[in-house]
Amino acid sequence: MSIDCNVVENVRYSRVLLKVSGEALAGERGFGFDQDVIGKLSCDLKKVRESGVELCIVVGGGNIFRGSSTSFGFERASNDYVGMLATMINALALQNSLEDMGIASRVLSAIPMTAVCETYIRRRAIRHLEKGRVVICAAGIGSPFFTTDTAAVLRSIEMRCDAIFKGTQVDGVYSSDPKKDCSATRYDKISYHDLLASDLKIMDAAAVSLARENSIPIIVFDLGKENAFSEVMKGRGTFTTISG
């Protein structure tokens, strides 16, 4: 597979957080990793990092474990902890792919796992960013009942990021699920208030409310498209901006 990993130019931000859903890493397989997807994503991340942008990533785990609190007879807290461990698997896989491309990265876990990665400490994470390393945050915020979207917003606030980029399987925020409703319309922009009032499910309410309180814009885009992240970083392509 030949991938163009040339440096992207004219980016609009200096430090950003990318939220990568687990489902996006699975590609069309729907479960586990799609190696081509991870390789293309890593190449895209390399372009952005080498353009001078400091980059933090929060990974989900839905490609490995997803289900309601009763899916496997687990109580909700246990269910969430299993999901946190799934994010660690994704984080280590992404780190390996990045370092194969020569991009220094560090995995920081909200749950101590000292045999495989560093424990998340805010000042340490910022220091890694300042040294040019990609910071990959795993295990959510380390507590059950909070989604990885909420973790992404929290980490972006802690690390003073300019914006949050949410890479999913759809190219923005729609009035309804575009996979189920062919008449769904996509928004170029939508306010935090309207997103919450319309009960649109692109992110949970806690995450959106936290972003609103701290005035951090959220850009939703389709991570599966070629060079999607680096293009959106330049304001190109199809995406939705949540702000105001």
Swiss-Prot record:
The entry's keywords: Allosteric enzyme, ATP-binding, Cytoplasm, Kinase, Nucleotide-binding, Pyrimidine biosynthesis, Transferase
The biological processes this protein is annotated with in GO are: 'de novo' CTP biosynthetic process; UDP biosynthetic process
Cite the InterPro entries for this sequence.
AceGlu_kinase-like_sf, Asp/Glu/Uridylate_kinase, Uridylate_kinase, Uridylate_kinase_bac
State which Enzyme Commission number(s) the record gives: 2.7.4.22
Q: Which Gene3D superfamilies match?
A: Acetylglutamate kinase-like
* Presence of the UniProt keyword Cell membrane in the record: no
State the pathway, as annotated in the record: Pyrimidine metabolism; CTP biosynthesis via de novo pathway; UDP from UMP (UMPK route): step 1/1
Location of this chain's protein in the cell: Cytoplasm
Q: Please give the chief subcellular localization of this protein.
A: cytoplasm
**Chemical reaction(s) catalysed:** UMP + ATP = UDP + ADP
Gene Ontology terms, cellular component aspect?
cytosol
Chain positions recorded as ATP binding sites: 19-22, 62, 66, 168-169, 174, 177
**Which chain regions cross the lipid bilayer?**
none
For the ligand (UMP), the binding residues are 61, 80, 141-148
This entry's Gene Ontology molecular function terms read: ATP binding; UMP kinase activity
Q: Which Pfam families match?
A: AA_kinase (PF00696)
Q: What does the entry report regarding how activity is regulated? A: Allosterically activated by GTP. Inhibited by UTP.
Q: For the region Involved in allosteric activation by GTP, what residue ranges are annotated?
A: 27-32
Subunit record text: Homohexamer.
Which family, according to UniProt? Belongs to the UMP kinase family.
What is known about what this protein does? Catalyzes the reversible phosphorylation of UMP to UDP.
What's the protein name? Uridylate kinase
Originating gene: pyrH
